[in-house]
Amino acid sequence: MSTLVHSLSLPGPRLVRAEILKLRRRRGLLAIVAAATVGASVVAYGILAILHAANPGHHGPAGGVLNLGHGMFVLSLLGSVAAIFIGATAGAGDLGAGVFRELAVTGRARSALFRARIPGGLAFLLSFVAAAYALAATASVVFAGYRTVPSPGLLAGAGAWLLLSCAFWFALALGLASLVGSRSTVIGALLAFELAVTPILASIPALGSGREVLPEVALTRLAPHAVRGLASNGGVVPASLGTAELVLVVWALALLALGEWRTVTRSA
């Protein structure tokens, strides 16, 4: 069995656990991710609850479908930031720390070293995202008041979409960082692309269907209809479901393939 795994260049459990441990040991990264996910959820719904308690006539309840959508916007935006930090760190962290050479000469397949970063990074990231969403989902129901209470189907769909969104940005950051070899460059480039470039391009009607190739536009298309307009960062652009799925798959697989290729061919 171990021979088969090695021949397929699949990462073993030890490699995956090692990747998770490397990420956990970065205290600064841990603080950023916790603040951008769990911290953001607590602060957002805490403020809404305090405002409602202080002036219920002016500020509505903190829960309901409406504020679930607002919460999804906050968590998808900050969760993607956390995903980019984790992906860039997983992809270029060994190079930055000067330990890539030691890993490359251990005899393990380089492709397995790269692929171990995918489940390792996702396990680290999605545990925080899931905890943050659990808080948001609970608050949207408990604090709904007179607002419409989210249905179980909506809560499940919104949670799955949030996990997908964060996992997608992690994959892009991991692949690009492995290709470029610079953590800071990738973080800066992807944050600028997601937070500045994408909203501008998505708001230009003259681009027409060309906007469908933007990752954020494709992700928005996959969001549950009840919160789609509220959770959008790149604007709601008409697109078919199949096109949106294809765009995300091509972006993720292309950058991951390039990242793995560079990891395998990089000079130690």
Describe each model-derived feature in a short phrase.
Residues 258-268:
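Membrane-interface capping segments at transmembrane-helix boundaries
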Residues 22, 92, 103-105, 173, ...:
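Helix-capping/transition residues at the boundaries of transmembrane alpha-helices
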Residues 206-232:
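Short hydrophobic, aromatic-rich alpha-helical segments embedded in or entering the lipid bilayer
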Residues 84-106, 110-111, 118:
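Transmembrane helix boundary and interhelical loop/hinge segments in multi-pass membrane proteins
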Residues 12-24:
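A short amphipathic helical element positioned immediately N-terminal to and/or at the very start
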Residues 218-222, 245-254:
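Small-residue-rich transmembrane alpha-helices that serve as helix-helix interface/gating elements
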Residues 2-9, 29-90, 114-183, 191-206, ...:
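Secretory targeting signals
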